Amino acid sequence: MSTVSQLIKKRRSSKTSKTKAPALSYGFNVLQKKAKHYSSPQKMGVCLRVTTMTPKKPNSALRKFARVRLSNGSEVTAYIPGVGHSLQEHSSVLVRGGRVKDLPGVRYHIVRGALDATGVANRKQGRSKYGSKLPKEKK
């Protein structure tokens, strides 16, 4: 417990919360060759490796993910949502924050329907999350 005189000398510091997507919180100045702190909702990146991994204990599947080098130079592991994808090495993708609960170390999602990541085909519901266009009506 702090005394009154200790608190007068130095007040209590408020807790600062850490960001859940640290790679989106800075950019890279190419001319000065140093990082600059500013947050972005998404960042562009290039796929280095596209592969699968198995989830944590009670679940069983082959989840698709990509290792992505972002425009600020950092490398992140990003999940590819939806059924089927056309991503391969050197594909340019848009990466947003958001972790995958049963994949350890995956803190980012690839945005479907942006850049080289095509939208999910034959999707009727929840289309905006998977970059699908409105299907044409048959007469």
Swiss-Prot record:
Transmembrane segments: none annotated. One of its GO terms (molecular function) is structural constituent of ribosome. Keywords: Ribonucleoprotein, Ribosomal protein, RNA-binding, rRNA-binding, tRNA-binding. PROSITE patterns: RIBOSOMAL_S12. One of its GO terms (biological process) is translation. Residues 1-21 are annotated as: Disordered. It comes from the Bacteria. InterPro entries: NA-bd_OB-fold, Ribosomal_uS12, Ribosomal_uS12_bac. GO terms for cellular component: small ribosomal subunit. Residues 8-18 have a biased composition (Basic residues). Belongs to the universal ribosomal protein uS12 family. NCBIfam families: rpsL_bact. With S4 and S5 plays an important role in translational accuracy. Interacts with and stabilizes bases of the 16S rRNA that are involved in tRNA selection in the A site and with the mRNA backbone. Located at the interface of the 30S and 50S subunits, it traverses the body of the 30S subunit contacting proteins on the other side and probably holding the rRNA structure together. The combined cluster of proteins S8, S12 and S17 appears to hold together the shoulder and platform of the 30S subunit. HAMAP family: Ribosomal_uS12_B. Part of the 30S ribosomal subunit. Contacts proteins S8 and S17. May interact with IF1 in the 30S initiation complex. This is Small ribosomal subunit protein uS12. It comes from Onion yellows phytoplasma (strain OY-M).
